[in-house]
Amino acid sequence: MIPKVIDLAAPVAAQFNLEVVGAVFQTNQSPPVLRVDIRNCDADTGLEDCEKMSRALEAVLDEDDVFPEAYVLEISSPGLSTLLTCDRDFVSFRGFPVLVQTHQPYRGHHQWIGNLTGRDEKFVQLNQKGRPIKIPREEILQVQLHDSPE
């Protein structure tokens, strides 16, 4: 059920320049609650974003009859994520310690820890103890904030 909700919600979110970051259906409440978390990659996610998404997604879910019984739809922001996914994240957290994980070993390592210095079309750049590191974006599985550089 949740994968279908995400499949329906993603194009709705894209219309408003939003991203769906998760969904959960809480059946322990009466009526059950469908919570969809969204994020605006261009600005802080605000109440207006949640309202627009709620109205538009409600219409899509009702039309598709995903939930035949009564439910409550909640749209919210997940808050600060440790994963860096959009350009805004890479600008906001420049200079912060990050952990970069790669699909395959890159130069013998699956993980790289250092201070984020930038990201462009081809590379994510780190400073690792004064040494610049460039990791090709196609090699990267994920980039996340890290507690402290090694």
UniProtKB/Swiss-Prot annotation:
The gene is rimP. This is Ribosome maturation factor RimP. One of its GO terms (biological process) is translation. It is found in: Cytoplasm. It comes from Acaryochloris marina (strain MBIC 11017). Pfam families: RimP_N. It comes from the Bacteria. Belongs to the RimP family. Keywords: Cytoplasm, Ribosome biogenesis. GO terms for cellular component: cytosol. Required for maturation of 30S ribosomal subunits.
